[in-house]
């Protein structure tokens, strides 16, 4: 039976060999840390689409483990809710992220990308994460929400602490991470409370003003839900894209043949981004709790036990993807689940796709001599979000 430490730096740097061992030897694996690990595509999709696997108990599960009350907003956003509340909250913001609306943002996204590359070109090198992958989606989501982009340094630290808290259920009870994550949520809630007060007095044509209007219209959205939704949109609105651009660029630079193919075939970019999402996706796992006993792969998962469907493992499952460890930008029938599946499918997927396509396409065209400065870039210590701390490149 294969065992693994989910927070081991070596595993986090390259989890895929471990995923393959688990999938082969113990695909429904019960960890000594008291949670279930699913690594087969079929099982992961089954859980994500099964209404018996729910999310609302997760906040209380973590709070009980650490003996702390859930911080403000935890359990109140659509990410943490089950129907009917999930349906109501998602409906309030879904119109802002439709493919049609996102297509209207292409020109602005291209403008931001061109500006960031122009700034880096003179230097001949950059940290691709800090100077390109991060500022692009932050600029875009700030403009959509109506958040002053000059405040991004303030919420960058909060965002990092909040996302570190996503792995709280895996940490020892003495860990300070949940408390730090809670403090960041408090700070970000206070920040948005101030912005909400400003927009109540002077509404604008931004998403924040639209959410406030919905809240003021009746019982569609409470103030606590409004603040939780703002935090979710700001954090999730850039984290996925940062990691898509960073992981995707690294994969291309490590596969020069595929990089050359992309440069020679610009029309390949949409297919390329889908393959990059599958090959080394920005979100590696999610979590659910069954509302009743459920049998998967011959093993019974008890009501109330934590289940972790590993998206990153499912997207390398040879039963679904032939030759799954090969990067193939022309891969067909690429039904990856990098953005999830079912009712919690990533609301911002159309935006992340367009940002990723424009960023990577422009990067490889404008910087034909782009290359890595180090062969061993450092990864963030996160099981949930797979992303690089830095990615030094030169050109």
What are the residue ranges of the model-derived segments?
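Cytochrome P450
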Residues: 1-395
